[in-house]
Design a protein with these regions (language model features):
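Conserved beta-strand hairpin/beta-sheet module of binuclear metal-dependent hydrolase folds
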Residues: 11-59, 205-220, 238
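Cap/insert and terminal regions of metallo-dependent hydrolase folds
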Residues: 227-327
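Active-site neighborhood of phospho(di)ester-bond hydrolases with catalytic His/Asp-centered motifs
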Residues: 43-46, 66-74, 95-97, 217-220, ...
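Short, basic/aromatic-enriched C-terminal tail that caps enzymatic domains
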Residues: 322-338
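Metallo-beta-lactamase
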Residues: 98-205, 211-212
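Metal-dependent catalytic neighborhoods of phosphoester/phosphodiester hydrolases
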Residues: 80-89, 105-107, 300-307
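Active-site metal-binding motif and surrounding structural segment of the metallo-beta-lactamase
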Residues: 49-100
Length: 338
């Protein structure tokens, strides 16, 4: 059931059920929106502001009603559109303090670079995060958007971009809120429970979002599934789980050996086999939907990820009525309503 949008453009919106939409998932950008009857939260803004708004509209979501952005960690594929989106909408951004500081260190020098220098740094960042860089995508657009904070055109009259100074501080946000892993907090009527995950970032976290009796767990960008994270994910109605790579494809693939080692390390990414091991041995079977996410376009195939998960669940899949879905890089996933 789709949400009923209010006639006024700002903030409030009536939603009949809790709704989750993965807008983008993969090495080139990640973003998910979770909505309750009173609150709408964006988890990560890993695509440009223009692309983010476009995908939200395609999914039937209204960007004007976003209440906050949560950040899992500071890697580019999770923060590309963060500053522009937050400023356009005038909404707070929630980080751990270490992630915020790492983000500021990374974004501030980049604004003072030429496009060539910025692109070289972006390629280096992409290699570090095992993200294939597509020169035909929106590199120039992303650079110009960050340099000028240009207006985002959605439809005439829908969103009026606020005037910004051409040389606005790239690290300036409308409001910054800090949280700590292990300590729950609330955004509107959504309770957010962050937990530490093993990844090569300053202070990476996963989230469990709970509202109206529904629990949504988000666990991507982790080298392995630690016991405390597994415990946090118990009782979730929706589980977004990383299934990044097929080990054989990664070993035989195009990445430099140093990047392959990083991806396979305990601070890298969860493989299909590792995700399947979690589902077989630690998953409690409570989720109506299991969303396999952050699939590598270079080192994985959707069907390989699906087959590994289905085999792990075995006969319990039909018994528990689990439904396995695949989040994609290029388009929003069909929304889940509960």
């Amino acid at each position: 059931m789709l949400p009923v949008l209010s006639s006024t453009p700002n903030r409030r919106i009536l939603i009949l059920m809790v709704r989750m939409t993965v807008l983008a998932s993969g090495s080139k950008g990640n973003s998910t929106v979770v909505s309750s009857s009173r609150t709408r939260i964006l988890v990560d803004a890993g695509v440009s502001c223009r692309e983010l708004f476009k995908r939200m509209q395609a999914a039937g979501e209204d960007p004007r009603t976003l209440d906050a952005i949560l950040v899992t960690h500071e890697h580019q594929d999770h923060i590309q559109g963060l500053s522009v989106t937050a400023r356009k909408l005038g909404i707070p951004v929630y980080f751990t303090e270490a992630t915020h500081r790492a983000w500021m260190r990374w974004i501030t020098p980049r604004k003072r670079m030429t496009y060539a220098e910025w692109l070289a740094q972006r390629k280096q960042q992409a290699e570090m995060t095992a993200a294939p860089l597509n020169p035909e995508m929106d590199d120039r657009e992303a650079f110009e958007e960050e340099q000028e904070s240009e207006s985002v055109e959605i439809r005439a009259g829908e969103i009026k971009a606020e005037e910004e100074k051409p040389k606005a501080d790239p690290a300036a946000l409308p409001r910054v809120e800090y949280f700590s892993a292990g300590e729950a907090f609330s955004v509107g009527d959504i309770t957010v429970s962050p937990f530490t995950i093993p990844h090569d970032a300053a202070d990476p976290v996963g989230f469990v979002l709970e509202t109206e009796g529904v629990r949504i767990g988000l666990a991507t960008d982790l080298g392995y599934m630690p016991a405390h994270a597994s415990m946090r994910l118990r009782g979730c109605n929706v589980l977004v789980l990383e299934s990044n790579h097929d080990l054989e494809m990664l070993r035989d693939g195009p990445y430099p050996w140093s990047v392959k080692q990083r991806v396979m390390s305990r601070v890298g990414h969860l493989s299909n086999d590792a995700a399947a091991e979690f589902l077989e041995n630690s998953y409690d079977g409570q989720a109506a939907y299991i969303v396999l996410a952050h699939l590598s376009e270079s080192n994985n195939l959707p069907e390989l990820a699906r087959i590994a998960a289905e085999r792990a669940l075995g006969g319990s899949m039909n018994l528990l009525a689990n439904k396995i879905l695949l989040a994609t890089q290029d388009a929003p996933m069909e929304s889940i309503t509960l």
